[in-house]
Design a protein with these regions (language model features):
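Membrane-proximal, glycine/serine-rich, low-complexity loop/turn segments characteristic
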Residues: 2-286
């Protein structure tokens, strides 16, 4: 019987099947149960409180957008989760320059390599209106290439932006609409008040063109519409015992869009390290506010 956890020098190996529960749908669900590993609400992974890089079979296809893997790959396809502490990712510097980097590697089962993997999920319900939660992902992990394609849509409060967020960058989950009057969010989990209509799609590709040479091309699209309402009422007791009430009612319609594309060329072997990146990021947002019957419109675009 395989051990649940094995450690050798700076490498810790977790047996996925030993931690997997019947209700676990994606590998992120299992990671949350592994000692020392934490998964934040936005999908960022920490090991002993430190951020990690994530690789699949030792290859870095996704960079900081690793939630595309952890929120889509079934634990049935992963044999072990490996934690590599003090990991020197530049092979030419290995043994010469120390590193405090931690890498989390998803080691695939042999049966999941070189075959096309497909996962589909969906739900449809009716309350005051129709609601949906539909998603699909296709994957291929071979010796010379890796590919993940995803498409998702929902209007049940599940925030798809986290999956497309670069976890190595400062969080952009809450935008600063400084020029717009915004409804005050309640002190609840976001999914409880996030009245959304969201769509996302990604394509992620890595190709090995030689020893230690990889080309990565990733692209993604995200769009969401969010409805918010708040009402505050403050009462003041005046000296003549009369009551003065001040009411503030704010309604928002928030539309956001994001389109990105990344291309990376990397040579990483015992003698040479070269990395070249090209990135494109387009973002747009439009906030329509109604404050006590007065309309405001705030729009921004960036490239």
């Amino acid at each position: 019987k395989a051990e649940k956890i094995e450690q050798k020098e700076d490498t810790v190996k977790y047996n996925v099947q030993a931690f997997k529960a019947p209700e676990d749908r994606v590998i992120e669900d299992v990671l949350k149960r592994m000692p020392g590993i934490s998964v934040l609400d936005g999908g960022k992974i920490l090991y002993k409180g430190k951020p990690v890089n994530l690789t699949i079979d030792g290859l870095d296809m996704l960079g900081g957008r690793y939630a595309i893997a952890t929120k889509n790959i079934s634990p049935d396809h992963i044999a072990t989760v490996e934690i590599l502490e003090n990991h020197q990712v530049i092979k030419a510097l290995k043994g010469l320059v120390p590193s405090d980097l931690t890498t989390l590697n998803l080691k695939l089962k042999a049966s999941s390599r070189g075959v096309f993997l497909l996962s589909l999920g969906g739900g449809l319900g009716y309350g005051d209106d129709w609601n949906r939660d539909v998603e699909g992902a296709g994957m291929y992990f071979g010796h010379k290439s890796q590919h993940i394609v995803t498409a998702k849509t929902n209007d049940i409060g599940s925030d798809l932006r986290y999956e497309l967020t670069d976890q190595s960058m400062p969080s952009d989950a809450v935008r600063n609409y400084s020029q717009a009057m915004m409804a005050t969010p309640p002190d609840l989990n976001r999914e409880r008040y996030y009245f959304n209509d969201s769509y996302s799609a990604t394509t992620n590709n890595l190709v090995k063109t030689g020893k230690g040479i990889t080309v990565v091309f990733n692209a993604g699209y995200f769009n969401t519409s969010d409805l918010r309402d708040s009402r505050n009422e403050t009462s003041y007791m005046l000296p003549d015992s009369s009551v003065n009430r001040i009411c503030e009612s704010i309604s928002n319609v928030i539309d956001e869009g994001r389109l990105y594309g990344d291309v990376s060329y990397k040579v990483n072997n015992e003698k040479v390290y070269i990395k070249t990146d090209a990135r494109l990021l387009c973002e747009s947002s439009d906030v329509l506010s109604d404050v006590n019957g007065i309309n405001q419109d705030y729009a921004s675009k960036s490239l």
